[in-house]
Amino acid sequence: MTLRSFLIFFLSSLILAGCSSVPESVTSVEWQAHEQRLETIHDFQATGKLGYIGPDQRQSLNFFWKHSTALSQLRLTTVLGQTALKLTITPQGATVETYDDQVLSARNANQLIYRLTGLMMPVDHMPDWLLGLPTDADTFQLSPANTLQTLDKQIGLNDWKIAYERYGDVEWHEQTLPLPNKLKLTTSDVKINLVITKWNITQ
């Protein structure tokens, strides 16, 4: 698998985390309070590392995800700091810039990902999944600390699962808010590890 093929596969796998379905009902008062706090976050930045393990490929990259109401941007860089891929989403459309200087644009991110992967998928929920919100999951489970522990979803013929393996306290509005800093995305033959080393909540 070439670097370009891996990047396209990783991007599509990451975005698949936001595919629509119906979540289970959770009535914990503590969880509802935590969920409401997360839902007030609209602007944030997340920096970290990712590891991809597939049947015939392993990759390690750094990532930077910037999200606001006006713009979402995902940048993947190599260990040497070279940009491998940059995805930008605005109300006007979406653009992908690759490591080999190719630029692809579309009216929306769904169309762009379809051109890259041949799959139609929504990207709207990705910021929520990073924050630990189970927006439109098939099923999910909570930890004893009333944070999101796992997500399950059926995507085509594949069963995907996100495990939230570790949280860290982030200072926000004069309080501490537990946010994910280690996630694992798995399906039958693919594993993607995400480690978020820094959160910056700007609103």
Swiss-Prot record:
Sites of N-palmitoyl cysteine lipidation: 19
Main subcellular location of this protein, as a coarse class: membrane
InterPro entries tied to this protein: LolA/LolB/LppX (IPR029046), OM_lipoprot_LolB (IPR004565)
Signal peptide range in chain numbering: 1-18
GO biological process, one term: lipoprotein localization to outer membrane
Membrane-topology annotation of the record: Lipid-anchor
Places the protein is found: Cell outer membrane
Coiled coil: none
Keywords: Cell outer membrane, Chaperone, Lipoprotein, Membrane, Palmitate, Protein transport, Signal, Transport
PROSITE patterns in the record: PROKAR_LIPOPROTEIN
Positions of S-diacylglycerol cysteine lipidation: 19
GO cellular component annotations of the record: cell outer membrane
Superkingdom of origin organism: Bacteria
Record family assignment: Belongs to the LolB family.
Subunit text: Monomer.
Cited function: Plays a critical role in the incorporation of lipoproteins in the outer membrane after they are released by the LolA protein.
Protein name, per record: Outer-membrane lipoprotein LolB
